[in-house]
A protein has these predicted regions:
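The feature primarily captures lumenal catalytic ectodomains
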Residues: 1-199
Length: 199
């Protein structure tokens, strides 16, 4: 509420039944897998400025990878991600674990404007709080989840969509995830990705 400039006074609480003759409900500015309006980005940018009013210390030469390896359950996971993150770390790519960060820290990370890399997922959607971020989205196959494309388009991100030419090995559901994949050659993918991201 604070980031939106609102207090409890902006809300109506009724303790008895009430009939409203008319209620206007705004259309959604973002609809999953379907559409996004620029006003959605405007709102998110305003929230970002409220949460991090000082902005971030720019780190344009820095690349970080948003890892899911510590998630206990979720939608999609890369089974051998720890080998991949170790190889990225050796090549100078920072590793962060969004699920272990507070909301403000996640937003502050985007404010510093590094190149952010990650497998397609909701953690990359938080780029929307600051305009024109640099994002490299790794797909689990030759197609990409539309939500990331919508966020990148609305935010005017410098977005790249990549996938491993060797293909990820499809393992199936299990261990708390709806789908598991395995990188066939973590060292090779990390080497190629680090060279691409840091060049």
């Amino acid at each position: 509420m604070t980031a939106l400039g609102m207090t409890e006074k902006n809300f109506l609480q009724t303790c008895t039944p009430v009939v409203f003759r008319r209620i206007d409900v705004a259309s959604v500015p973002f609809e999953e897998l379907s559409l996004v309006h620029t006003i959605y980005a405007d709102l998110m940018h305003a929230i970002g400025r409220q949460i991090i009013p000082e902005g971030g210390q720019p780190l344009p030469a820095r690349a970080i990878y948003m890892s899911k390896e510590r998630l206990r359950n979720g939608n999609v996971r890369v089974d051998n991600e720890s080998a991949f993150t170790a190889a990225l770390r050796e090549r100078g790519v920072g590793i962060v674990y969004p699920e272990e960060m507070g909301f403000r820290d996640q937003i502050k990370l985007w404010a510093s404007n590094p190149t952010v890399i990650g497998f397609s997922g909701a953690s990359l959607h938080t780029s929307i709080f600051f305009p024109e971020r640099r994002v490299i989205t790794l797909a689990h196959g030759p197609d990409i989840w539309a939500n990331q494309c919508l966020i990148d388009m609305a935010n005017n991100n410098d977005a790249q969509y990549l996938y491993d030419a060797n293909g990820l090995e499809h393992i199936g559901a299990g261990n708390g995830f709806n789908m598991n994949y395995r990188i066939r050659n973590p060292e090779q993918l990390a080497s190629e990705l680090a060279e691409y991201a840091l060049s």
